[in-house]
From Swiss-Prot:
Optimum pH is 6.0-10.5. Keywords: Blood coagulation cascade activating toxin, Complement system impairing toxin, Disulfide bond, Fibrinolytic toxin, Glycoprotein, Hemostasis impairing toxin, Hydrolase, Platelet aggregation activating toxin, Protease, Secreted, Serine protease, Toxin. It comes from Bothrops pirajai (Piraja's lancehead). GO terms for cellular component: extracellular region. Belongs to the peptidase S1 family. Snake venom subfamily. This is Thrombin-like enzyme BpirSP41.
Length: 50
């Protein structure tokens, strides 16, 4: 994350995972509309519903 800040360990306690085409990726729910995941989890035209 470029320009990001460190957060408290309890600030974002909710996790999710994504399974697509045989791959698992972890996600962190950072607010009601956004999840944060690693760059290698990017899949074009993917839609995520929570």
């Amino acid at each position: 994350v470029v320009g990001g800040d460190e957060c408290d360990i309890n600030e974002h306690p909710f996790l999710a995972f994504l399974y697509s085409h045989g791959y698992f990726c972890g996600l962190t729910l950072i607010n009601q509309e956004w999840v944060l995941t690693a760059a290698h989890c990017d899949r074009r035209f993917m839609r995520i519903y929570l």
